[in-house]
Amino acid sequence: MSLQWTTVATFLYAEVFAVLLLCIPFISPKRWQKVFKSRLVELVVTYGNTFFVVLIVILVLLVIDAVREILKYDDVTEKVNLQNNPGAMEHFHMKLFRAQRNLYIAGFSLLLSFLLRRLVTLISQQATLLASNEAFKKQAESASEAAKKYMEENDQLKKGAAEDGDKLDIGNTEMKLEENKSLKNDLRKLKDELASTKKKLEKAENEALAMQKQSEGLTKEYDRLLEEHAKLQASVRGPSVKKEE
C-alpha cells in the first residue's frame, strides 16, 4: 500500500474510533460539551471549516482516482493476451483488487467525515437543550415557590381583612393580588417553555439515537469489507505461491 493510501486508511481508523467513542452511552452530552468548549478544541475549530473543505476535496479526488483505476482494470480479457503473457491475468486481478480496496477506504473515509461532523453537532445541540431545560426547570420551581408564598400571604391578608376590615390597607391588598396574578402568568409561561424544551430535547435524543444506529451499521459494514479484503488477498496470494513452488 502506498504512502497516500496508508495515510487515508489511518485516517479512516481514527474516524471509526472517534465515532465509536462519541456513541458510548455512559458519557453524557454535557461532558462532551466541556471537551468541545476546551481551548484546544476551540483552536482546532477556528481552522476547522477550511480543513474540512480541503479534506473533502482530497477524499473526493481519491474516490475518483479509485473509480478510474477500477474502470481501467475492469475488463481484463480485452487487454491481456493470455497466450503470450499467461501471468498477466494475476497481475491485472491484483491491480483491480487494489483499486477496489482504495475505493472502499476513500469512500468510507468521506462518509464518516460527514457523519462525524453531524454527530458532534447533534451532541452539542443536545447538551445545550439539557442545560436550557435545567435552567427553565429551576426558574419554574422558583416561580412556583414564590407564587405559593404570595398565595399564602394573600390568604392571610384576606383573613386579616375579614377580622379587622377597618385596619387593613386596601391599596396593599390590591397590590398583592396583582403580584399574585403576575406570578401566575409567569409560572404558566415557564411551564409552556419547559414543555417546548422537553419536546426539542426528545427530538435531539431521537436524532442522536438514529445517528448511533447508523454508525453501528457502518462499523459492521466496514468489518464485513475487511473480511472480504482478507479473503480476496488470500485468494490472490494463493496462485502466486503455487506458481513459485
From Swiss-Prot:
Transmembrane regions listed in the UniProt entry: 7-27, 44-64, 103-123
Membrane-topology annotation of the record: Multi-pass membrane protein
Post-translational note: Cleaved by CASP8 and other caspases.
Subcellular location(s) of the protein: Endoplasmic reticulum membrane; Endoplasmic reticulum-Golgi intermediate compartment membrane
GO cellular component, one term: plasma membrane
One BP term from GO: positive regulation of intrinsic apoptotic signaling pathway
Tissue: Ubiquitous.
Pfam families, sorted: Bap31, Bap31_Bap29_C
Main localization, broad class: endoplasmic reticulum
Positions in the Lumenal compartment: 2-6, 65-102
Cytoplasmic topological segments: 28-43, 124-245
Coiled coil, from the record: 165-236
UniProt keyword annotations, A-Z: Apoptosis, Coiled coil, Endoplasmic reticulum, ER-Golgi transport, Membrane, Protein transport, Transmembrane, Transmembrane helix, Transport
Residues under site feature: Cleavage: D164, G165
A Gene Ontology molecular function term of the record: MHC class I protein binding
Main function: Functions as a chaperone protein. Is one of the most abundant endoplasmic reticulum (ER) proteins. Plays a role in the export of secreted proteins in the ER, the recognition of abnormally folded protein and their targeting to the ER associated-degradation (ERAD). Also serves as a cargo receptor for the export of transmembrane proteins. Plays a role in the assembly of the mitochondrial membrane respiratory chain NADH dehydrogenase (Complex I) by stimulating the translocation of NDUFS4 and NDUFB11 from the cytosol to the mitochondria via interaction with TOMM40.
Subunit structure: Homodimer and heterodimer with BCAP29. Binds CASP8 (isoform 9) as a complex containing BCAP31, BCAP29, BCL2 and/or BCL2L1. Forms a complex (via C-terminus) with TOMM40 which mediates the translocation of components of the mitochondrial membrane respiratory chain NADH dehydrogenase (Complex I) from the cytosol to the mitochondria; within the complex BCAP31 interacts directly with unprocessed and processed NDUFS4 and NDUFB11. Interacts with VDAC1. Interacts with VAMP3, VAMP1 and membrane IgD immunoglobulins. Interacts with HACD2.
PANTHER family, per database record: B-CELL RECEPTOR-ASSOCIATED PROTEIN 31, BCR-ASSOCIATED PROTEIN, BAP
Name of this chain's protein: B-cell receptor-associated protein 31
UniProt organism field: Mus musculus
